[in-house]
UniProtKB/Swiss-Prot annotation:
PANTHER family, A to Z: MITOCHONDRIAL TRNA-SPECIFIC 2-THIOURIDYLASE 1, TRNA 5-METHYLAMINOMETHYL-2-THIOURIDYLATE -METHYLTRANSFERASE
Annotated gene: mnmA
Protein name per Swiss-Prot or TrEMBL: tRNA-specific 2-thiouridylase MnmA
Organism: Staphylococcus aureus (strain NCTC 8325 / PS 47)
Gene3D superfamilies: Adenine nucleotide alpha hydrolases-like domains (2.30.30.280), HUPs (3.40.50.620), Translation factors (2.40.30.10)
Region annotated Interaction with target base in tRNA, chain positions: 97-99
Binding site for ATP: G11, M12, S13, G14, G15, V16, D17, S18, M37, G126
């Protein structure tokens, strides 16, 4: 089968990465369709809907490339699967990662299903990751060539079935090369700045946004031995290891968030970047997913490396099944500021094995009060 007989539906955001993704596939001779996903009603404070601006860029790019385009609305699916999860996690005092859930439930489920209904053989996105297809048909996901842009951390929940239908055309090149291609082709998005922050918040103030959905409950900010250091403006606004926004003055080292007590609405703080309370030995994680589950013996356990947040250096770990629903991830050396609600993502070299959601954090066999 030649490329012209293979239909690839590209998820287009109106950014440079997805624009170049569509261009590269078109150049390679595939039957390419562009689809713009509207996942959130994101009218800004000035009454301007940024999604409309992005869709106009998609239209212009698709016309430049010479491919058909459509818009599809996933606002209900996004609210049900991503945003309610986001709010529920904050209610529990955790720090969620909505991008992981968006990839799992929207971009590579709702969008993938929609594309298959359009007769697609594959979907493609502008993620910085790579797919390795083996002769027997199974696939592996590898880090993107550009280390600064690698996005496998956010793709850790994707299954073998999902990834077998996915292409990441720009995963083999650097971001600077993506920009160069866009400029060379005269694409309207060539100089458009990258989107930052959580997809549905955009450039809005995080505190202001969150307070629209969850009422803030101010409370005491104390040290672990009970010394009152001030007031917090609501536990949901703070994450483990956070330094800024505490409002604690005085001499000496800066102060950091080391824990939360939901029952008493207390924020725990301690002084010093390397304070002992910020370090842990192992964690328990649930909702785990592996691209190739049969390759990992969870009963015996296995060694690999892991990331506990995006753009963090890999840490050597030992992964073993804790029970039917959870994994125990033991660190080769203590790790700072592990945060419940965030993803722990596993690697063997460049291969992303999968990931899980961090639940509880331990040191010396005792659970830390990161979130209690």
């Amino acid at each position: 089968m030649s490329n012209k007989d293979i239909r690839v539906v590209v998820g287009m955001s109106g950014g440079v990465d997805s624009s170049v993704t569509a261009h590269v596939l078109k150049e390679q001779g595939y039957d390419v369709i562009g689809i713009f996903m509207k996942n959130w009603d994101d009218t800004d404070e000035n009454g301007v809907c940024t999604a409309t601006e992005d869709y106009n860029d998609v239209i212009e790019v698709c016309n430049q490339i010479g491919i058909p385009y459509y818009a599809v609305n996933f606002e209900k699916e996004y609210w049900d699967k991503v945003f309610t999860y986001f709010l529920d996690e904050y209610k529990k005092g955790r720090t969620p990662n909505p991008d992981v859930m968006c990839n799992k439930e929207i971009k590579f489920k709702a969008f993938l299903d929609h594309a298959m209904n359009l007769g697609a053989d594959y979907v493609a996105t502008g993620h910085y990751a790579r797919i390795h297809r083996h002769e027997d048909g199974h696939v592996e996901m590898l880090r993107g060539v550009d280390n600064n842009k690698d996005q496998t951390y956010f793709l850790n929940q994707l299954s073998q079935q999902q990834l077998s239908k996915v292409m990441f055309p720009i995963g083999d090149i650097e971001k600077s090369e993506v920009r160069r291609i866009a400029e060379e082709q005269g694409l309207v998005t060539a100089k458009k700045k990258d989107s930052t922050g959580i997809c549905f918040i955009g450039e809005k103030n995080f505190k202001t946004f969150l307070s629209q959905y969850l009422p803030a409950q101010p409370g005491d900010m104390i040290t672990l031995d009970g010394k009152k250091m001030g007031k917090h403006s609501g536990l949901m606004y703070y994450t483990i290891g956070q330094r800024h926004g505490l409002g604690i003055g005085g001499d000496g080292d800066p102060w950091f968030v080391v824990g939360k007590n939901l029952k008493d609405n207390v924020l725990y703080v301690e002084q010093g970047f390397h304070h002992d309370a910020l370090y842990s030995d192992y964690l328990i994680a649930s909702d785990y997913s592996f691209v190739n589950p049969e390759d990992n013996d969870l009963d015996q356990g296995f060694e690999c490396t892991a990331k506990f947040r995006y753009r963090q250096k890999d840490t050597k770990v030992f992964v073993k099944r804790e029970n039917d629903h959870a994994l125990r991830v033991t660190f080769a050396e203590p790790v700072r500021a592990i945060t419940p609600g965030q993803a722990v993502v596993f690697y063997q070299g460049d291969v992303c094995l999968g990931g899980a959601t961090i639940d509880d954090v331990f040191k010396n066999e005792g659970q830390l009060n990161y979130v209690v």
